[in-house]
């Protein structure tokens, strides 16, 4: 038994149940980190030599390097394609990397995840004031954020229903 604590909080958009969100893999593939980028962004418990053959990996596995914990990554390495059916969850966790790249925001100024109830979400997670000035962050308003997130979600999911989703307070919980 444990307690749930708010780990991160910010304004963003809920996409719905993570297992019911379908992603446009062609769009995601265009923004997938190169091997060199993955080496910079990877989780600390993943060794550099474990990225051998990165260029030939399936799309979801490339995103596992930076979005999943080492245990999940090693499970995939030891049992090839065992995580293929979890691609929606993996892509939900990768949304903020793609969004930041598309709109010029600094790395880790947004956060995307799915919570214990399976709700996928992406939200602004920047601490104010940011350490370095960034024009995109400086010009952000709630209206602009909502417009950008809606445009992005329509493109990354290829589903126009996200064009009308409202901004909400999103919270990522941890269980301790």
Give a label for each model feature.
Residues 167-170:
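Glycine-rich, aromatic-bearing surface loops/beta-hairpins
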Residues 1-147, 151-159, 174-176:
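Acidic (Asp/Glu-rich) sequence patches and key acidic residues
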Residues 160-164:
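Short helix-terminating capping/connector loops at secondary-structure junctions
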């Amino acid at each position: 038994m444990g307690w749930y604590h708010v780990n991160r909080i910010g304004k963003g958009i809920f996409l719905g149940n993570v297992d019911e969100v379908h992603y446009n893999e062609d769009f995601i593939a265009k923004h997938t980190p190169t091997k060199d980028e993955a080496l910079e962004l990877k989780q600390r418990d993943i060794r550099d030599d474990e990225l051998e053959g990165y260029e030939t990996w399936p799309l979801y596995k490339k995103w596992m390097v930076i979005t999943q914990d080492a245990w999940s990554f090693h499970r995939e390495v030891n049992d090839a394609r065992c995580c293929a059916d979890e691609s929606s969850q993996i892509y939900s966790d990768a949304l903020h990397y793609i969004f930041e790249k598309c709109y010029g925001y600094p790395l880790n100024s947004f956060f995307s995840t799915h919570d214990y109830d399976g709700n996928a979400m992406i939200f602004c997670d920047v601490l104010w004031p940011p350490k370095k000035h960034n024009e995109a962050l400086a010009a952000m308003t709630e209206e602009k954020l909502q417009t950008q997130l809606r445009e992005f979600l329509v493109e990354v999911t290829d589903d126009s229903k996200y064009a009308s989703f409202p901004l909400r307070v999103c919270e990522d919980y941890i269980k301790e």
